[in-house]
């Protein structure tokens, strides 16, 4: 029994090596309620009381007093029914005694059963506290993991929303660039090669800026035109001009529709400087700004415009045919240099269908001599037949021909 008491006391006398508290355990230890702190204080006071009692018991064993041993055995058999043991038990379980009562408790003899129960109580309290700490730490770990998952989910949602926003921005930017390209379709871009991309980028950037475009207001006088021998019935005020104020970037479609409604004539065609103005065209694209801001535009009925176009084509064909005839006639002339020992040299231009005899007559007329059959022409040592045409001979332009006068 004495060995058992010493082992139990040795268990409580040895220092307990506890692992260092982590951050979660420190939070739990700092946030514990007043009841747990009171229990820890009770266990600490009980441990101090047991150490003091150990010294007293060791001294009593050395003195070998049989009465104390006998009382100890009887207390163990009676199951802690002695009234004298109530005060230490109350001091250990409740821990509410004052320092004076603690001294009185130490001076009274304590049975080994009391020591065993105190050790079991302290061991159970330590196990329960460790279990509570492990359970609380596991709960904190689960909470921390859930918070990490929530943060990851928020990050993924942010990345997804940012990618969708980038796609919308790029789509909007592409639409703006397409609108700028359509607006600046009539404006010529700078010349560039395949290898020179900087020039093309610079030319596009000039028209894609957000600076406001200053439009010029033009005054157009639209006058109706008639063509001769036309079978189209037109209103009496067809040739009366109508004035329109048009911006430089405004399409001609509005002008044409307004003029047609005012004159009550369908299929009107607008013409400026012999060029048709299409509905999608603008004054800036038609080059009106280079001429003036007050201009005259001619209006034709569509059928009259087709007839006028055909007449102009015929005139162009006729003019080209006349030019071809004059060019052909010019090509049929040949220039020859005629030399004689009895007269001066003479340069003549004659058609190639002339005969050699006609060439001789022309020469006699120029030098004012009488024509006779004995006058002959020699070219490169050969006599030319008077009945041959010039184009059938080997004569070419600027050749020299000798005239022999007999």
Swiss-Prot record:
Phosphorylated by cds1. One of its GO terms (cellular component) is nucleus. Disulfide bonds: none annotated. The keyword DNA repair applies. This is DNA repair protein rad60. Required for repair of DNA double strand breaks which occur during replication, or induced by UV or gamma radiation, via recombination between sister chromatids. This has a subsequent role in the maintenance of chromosome structure. May work in conjunction with the Smc5-Smc6 complex. Interacts with rfp1 and smc5. GO terms for biological process: double-strand break repair via homologous recombination; replication fork processing. It comes from the Eukaryota. It comes from Schizosaccharomyces pombe (strain 972 / ATCC 24843). InterPro entries: Rad60/SUMO-like_dom (IPR022617), Ubiquitin-like_dom (IPR000626), Ubiquitin-like_domsf (IPR029071). The lineage of its organism: Eukaryota, Fungi, Dikarya, Ascomycota, Taphrinomycotina. Keywords: DNA damage, DNA recombination, DNA repair, Nucleus, Phosphoprotein. The gene is rad60. It is found in: Nucleus. SUPFAM superfamilies: Ubiquitin-like (SSF54236).
């Amino acid at each position: 029994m004495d060995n058992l008491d010493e082992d139990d006391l040795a268990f409580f006398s040895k220092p307990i090596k506890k692992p260092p508290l982590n951050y979660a355990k420190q939070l739990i230890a700092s946030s514990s309620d007043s009841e747990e702190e009171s229990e820890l204080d009770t266990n600490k006071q009980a441990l101090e009381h047991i150490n003091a009692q150990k010294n007293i018991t060791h001294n009593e064993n050395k003195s070998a007093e049989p009465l104390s041993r006998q009382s100890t055995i009887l207390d163990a058999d009676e199951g802690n029914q002695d009234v004298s043991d109530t005060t230490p038990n109350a001091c250990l379980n409740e821990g509410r005694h004052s320092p004076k009562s603690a001294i009185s408790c130490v001076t009274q003899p304590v049975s080994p059963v009391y020591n065993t129960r105190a050790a079991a109580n302290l061991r159970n309290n330590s196990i329960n506290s460790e279990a509570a700490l492990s359970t609380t730490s596991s709960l904190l770990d689960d909470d921390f993991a859930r918070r990490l998952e929530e943060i990851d989910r928020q990050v993924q949602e942010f990345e997804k929303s940012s990618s969708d926003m980038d796609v919308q921005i790029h789509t909007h930017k592409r639409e703006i660039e397409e609108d700028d390209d359509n607006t600046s379709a009539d404006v010529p871009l700078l010349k560039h090669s395949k290898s020179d991309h900087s020039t093309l980028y610079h030319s596009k950037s000039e028209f894609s800026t957000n600076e406001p475009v200053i439009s010029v207001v033009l005054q157009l006088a639209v006058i109706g035109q008639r063509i001769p021998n036309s079978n189209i019935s037109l209103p009496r005020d067809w040739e009366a001009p109508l004035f329109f104020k048009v911006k430089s970037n405004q399409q001609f479609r509005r002008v044409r529709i307004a003029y047609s409604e005012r004159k009550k004539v369908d299929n009107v065609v607008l013409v400026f400087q012999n060029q048709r103005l299409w509905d999608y065209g603008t004054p800036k694209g038609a080059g009106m700004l280079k001429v003036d801001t007050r201009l005259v535009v001619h209006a034709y009925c569509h059928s009259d415009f087709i007839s006028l176009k055909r007449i102009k084509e015929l005139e162009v064909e006729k003019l080209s045919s006349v030019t071809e005839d004059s060019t052909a006639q010019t090509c049929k002339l040949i220039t020859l240099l005629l030399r004689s020992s009895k007269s001066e040299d003479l340069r003549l231009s004659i058609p190639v269908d002339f005969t050699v005899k006609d060439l001789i007559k022309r020469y006699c007329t120029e030098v004012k001599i009488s024509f006779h059959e004995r006058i002959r022409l020699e070219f490169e040592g050969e006599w030319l037949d008077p009945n041959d045409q010039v184009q059938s001979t080997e004569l070419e332009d600027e050749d020299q021909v000798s005239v022999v006068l007999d």
